Amino acid sequence: MTNDKEKRLKELNRMQYEVTQNNGTEPPFQNEFWDHKEEGIYVDIISGKPLFSSLDKFDAHCGWPSFTKPLEDEEVAEKVDKSHGMVRTEVRSKTADSHLGHVFPDGPGPNGLRYCINSAALKFIPKDDLEKEGYGDLKHLFD
């Protein structure tokens, strides 16, 4: 992963790098996926690992893409974040060890969670492109 990760890091734009590598936060309502409604999956911009599905996305009125759960729990790590004078739970990509966003206990759904994720940490794969992009094993989610 190291050489591949180094290559992908060089391909990131300034905001993507700031968010994923320096635990930054992009502006609300001024990011690619905050109101994105197309069906598909959201993958880690660095590792390419599937992280979230449009089926679990909802409008939290916060200005960032929000999800009720990750696609696979083993792909995300949670860590206590005491920055900015707050205590929050940071969400990180396990494979790439990059910052994704935060999870809050104020979401809808059975778990009551809201995964508030920076668009800059994600790449969207439309459901019709899952096969050609190498995520064909996830097509069943949209049947």
From Swiss-Prot:
Alphabetized UniProt keyword annotations: Oxidoreductase
GO MF terms held by the record: peptide-methionine (R)-S-oxide reductase activity
Catalytic residues (UniProt): C116 (nucleophile)
Location of the MsrB domain: 5-127
First-level EC class: oxidoreductase
EC number: 1.8.4.12
A Pfam family the protein falls into: SelR
Gene3D superfamilies: Peptide methionine sulfoxide reductase
One GO cellular component, as annotated: cytoplasm
Coiled coil: none
Superkingdom of origin organism: Bacteria
GO biological process: protein repair; response to oxidative stress
The name this protein goes by in its record: Peptide methionine sulfoxide reductase MsrB
